[in-house]
Amino acid sequence: RRMIWILLACSPSQPFQCNGSELLCDKAIDQSTVLGTHNSMASTEAGFLPPNHVYGIPQQLRDGVRGLNLDTYWSEDQAMLCHGICELGQQPLVDALSDVKAFLDEQPYSVIIITFQAAISAEQTVAAFEQAELASEMYEHPLSTAWPSLITLIENQQRLIVFASNDGGMVPGYMDQWTHWIDNPY
């Protein structure tokens, strides 16, 4: 009889890399910097005229973007991503959120911040999150408390921090941008 020996190569376990770096895991989200894109959906790849970016949201996420700025409108009886004029480019919000879900499924140690410039209601927006099976990932930050670390958000499966410039705070997980951060006019 012949005996076959199978040797398995063992390597030391890789440290967690929260948003691409093990150094970020213990950092609170408000102590972290993320790369973001403005009008993230407006890309050549997605057919927007004029585009802000060459690549669409899936490639942006693969390239390290963790902050998405999205403009939403109601068009064709659904929540759409548009850059002002929907006739010059649009994408169903649920499709973009499905891309985000696919990315989070592939990269479970990522946290993404989404900021909406919304011309639709909080309920319409959150319905798209529910349809894309992402609503449970939305983090709701209690006021007057410290922000959690990235690893805490990851372990709690709350890997989406969602803000809105209007109508935020009306639905859990869809937070008011101006309650939580400051912006300048430039």
Model-identified regions with their sequence ranges:
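Sec-dependent signal peptide recognition
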Residues: 1-7
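Catalytic cores of phosphodiester-bond hydrolases, prominently lipid phosphodiesterases
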Residues: 15-186
